[in-house]
């Protein structure tokens, strides 16, 4: 489990999600500092089964929906609204590989001081070159070359994303090595650069 297997405050059944008990259908009080893996009941790991994540989200979305608690006591209505909001944020974060990587890095780094502006060696110079190239293509409105550049940037982004799994596994094997977390931070920074460049390229229908 992603947490220390707390029990339902009503029936004492071990919880899947910290937000709701599927055994007795009771909303659960939860701590202010709750991590998103606890919310959806998954181990703290970068690798997630996307189908299981979607299924768990839909289950909880239905059970927590405020409409079901419209006639409940005010405290329970508020708990439902808060839990639903947290659920949506948790799902959005864990569903997206980049957001999940950034969130997991935040959990793992704890009080470590990471260089949040670091980039892979040579990446920044390459980005300056690509940015100038993109500026020229946007000025010329060359749709063919813009499309080719979009594909190139997308491939670069996917290559960075492909490194997340082995890097997180490496950290699992060597949790004392802070350099691995710094590598992950650099990869995330690089991917943000690429995303910003991609966002500048007009989409075509």
Predicted regions, residues:
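C-terminal accessory/regulatory regions appended to core domains
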Residues: 1-205
């Amino acid at each position: 489990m992603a947490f220390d297997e707390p029990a339902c405050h009503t029936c004492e059944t071990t919880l899947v999600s910290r937000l709701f008990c599927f055994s007795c259908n009771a909303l659960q009080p939860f701590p202010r500092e709750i991590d998103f893996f606890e919310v959806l009941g998954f181990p703290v790991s970068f690798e997630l089964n996307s189908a299981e994540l979607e299924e768990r989200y839909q289950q909880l979305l239905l059970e927590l929906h405020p409409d079901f608690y419209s006639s409940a006591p005010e405290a329970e209505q508020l708990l439902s609204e808060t839990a639903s909001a947290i659920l949506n944020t948790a799902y959005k974060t864990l569903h997206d590989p980049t957001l999940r990587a950034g969130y997991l890095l935040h959990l793992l780094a704890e009080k470590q001081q990471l260089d949040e502006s670091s980039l892979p060696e040579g990446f920044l110079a390459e980005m300056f070159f690509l940015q100038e190239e993109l500026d020229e293509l946007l000025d010329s409105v060359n749709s063919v070359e813009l499309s080719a550049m979009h594909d190139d940037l997308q491939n670069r982004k996917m290559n960075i994303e492909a490194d997340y799994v082995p890097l997180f596994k490496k950290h699992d094997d060597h949790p004392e090595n802070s350099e691995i977390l710094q590598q992950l931070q650099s990869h995330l920074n690089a991917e943000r650069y690429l995303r910003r460049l991609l966002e500048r390229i007009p989409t075509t229908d």
